[in-house]
Regions:
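Conserved motor-region signature of P-loop NTPase helicases/translocases
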Residues: 1-75, 86-88, 102, 109-113, ...
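Amphipathic, charged-and-aliphatic alpha-helical interface segments
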Residues: 76-82
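Basic, alpha-helical interaction scaffolds
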Residues: 95-99, 104-107
Length: 188
């Protein structure tokens, strides 16, 4: 029994159990904005909603979704003309960033037409986002990813689905997911 969930001990116990392949249910309360995988996905969503958002694009490029190094990002940002957005500079590049540009072009082309859930699912499946996030952040990233998908579905049932609306809805309150622990389940 852990007295509080705020300390790092609780998170470390869950991580150690997952690494030891013990059947673990995870935390009973998950604050999705604290999950790194969720932050990476929402950074990409923020860029898709507003391509002029240099910070969100930089965060997405450095995330496991694209795997850019600090040097690659610095080179792109430093060598761009004055008053040029990072997205414009990336589009003007030739060569090395072809795969990144293809993914971003695909997602930008769909951002105005797909519902938030479908857009997130496209990032995670078609473009290998789930695999990349879990490979870099560990199995515990799956909990945050699944919670974000569930929240996207919940949002779509309560509001007219739009990407900017979903991002505002996520920001409006600290979204916490409370899990129902199944008594019949043989999980820690």
């Amino acid at each position: 029994l852990v007295r509080g969930r705020v300390s790092g001990l609780f998170t470390e116990i869950i991580r150690a159990c997952k690494q030891a392949d013990l059947p673990i249910a995870g935390a009973d309360v998950l604050k999705i904005s604290d999950e790194l995988a969720v932050r990476d996905i929402t950074a990409l969503l923020r860029f898709l909603a507003l391509p002029e958002d240099d910070l969100s694009l930089a965060c997405a490029l450095r995330s496991p979704l694209f795997g850019w190094t600090e040097q690659q990002l610095y080179t792109l940002a430093h060598h761009r003309p004055d008053k040029t957005y990072l997205w414009q500079a990336l589009r003007g590049q030739t060569g090395l960033q072809g795969a990144t540009l293809a993914i971003l072009d695909d997602l930008r082309g769909q951002a105005d037409f797909l519902r938030p859930y479908d857009l997130i699912a496209r990032i995670l499946t078609r473009h290998g986002g789930r695999k990349a996030l879990i490979a870099r952040l560990g199995d515990e990233a799956a909990d945050g990813i699944d919670a974000l998908l569930a929240q996207a579905l919940a949002y779509e049932t309560s509001d007219v689905p739009s990407l900017t609306g979903f991002l505002e809805w996520l920001d409006s309150d600290e979204v916490q997911v409370k899990r129902q622990m199944d008594a019949a389940s043989d999980r820690i």
